[in-house]
């Protein structure tokens, strides 16, 4: 799902050398909780008599992408409480990586020094690519990212898995859905050319759109430093006769796009993917502008099947969970099921756990918040995306 400027770098280095560097900064000062203010984020189930199993979480809790990282952190924390049992008492700690690859590796090593036995993270794609390179080195630590969607995250690694759809999967499914339901529309493809999530979906969408005979009359792009106004791009799309926008972008720029279209009187349909989940919670956004918006996502807070999770999340964190939180929760669920499948003790060594959890992942089925999840030996998830339309401020299945 996520790239969000997760800056990458060459992470192939001795893990313990990075741990030593982190220790030099003072581990206690680095450990941060599930709030932008930081603090200890250790969590456990008060009802569990099981042995302690340590799960790490990494994501941006400060900076421009903080809302995504905080959701992931909260989802992991809540999952650790809910899935603890008489065998495993799940304890979590989280680290802030500011959506930066180098900082994410430092965070990973800090958690490894803490004794992390499995990682549910990082949040962003660039950070996940960097951390996956280190997690796959000996001594390995099992990693499942809730929200990074690039195939580069898992490629060539036996112990790295994903909870969310891959970018190609989203692009292909979106094109097929639009061909079946909006085949007469004229499309403008609108995406962030500097973002691997957005451009990855766009590339797959274009290929499938050609096969599905969708008419793309315009293609408009932007970059991270130009997200305050999209009037120029919309003007071009309108002049070329586009009647529908396909925009695999995040909810913050999507809110700007909808407002710009409204301000210029451009009546155009719009569809996004899972990164657009959360648009109704954008601060200062007139949510009436999102009426009729389509998005493809495996999670809806309005689905009655998710009511218990939504209530527990609201009670704990004072806000409605988004897909980032749900994916993180499902990530913890997957670790719990894989541990059970592998028959591992709570005090299992992280390196031993890594290979056995990876083997178990291809055998389990998780009935999660984001669907029924299974995994292949490439670490990619199989689950069905669902198209929703926003009506009266709620998600309704399209």
Which residues fall in each region the model found?
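N-terminal secretory signal peptides
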Residues: 1-13, 21-32
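Bacterial lipoprotein signal-peptidase II cleavage site
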Residues: 34-46
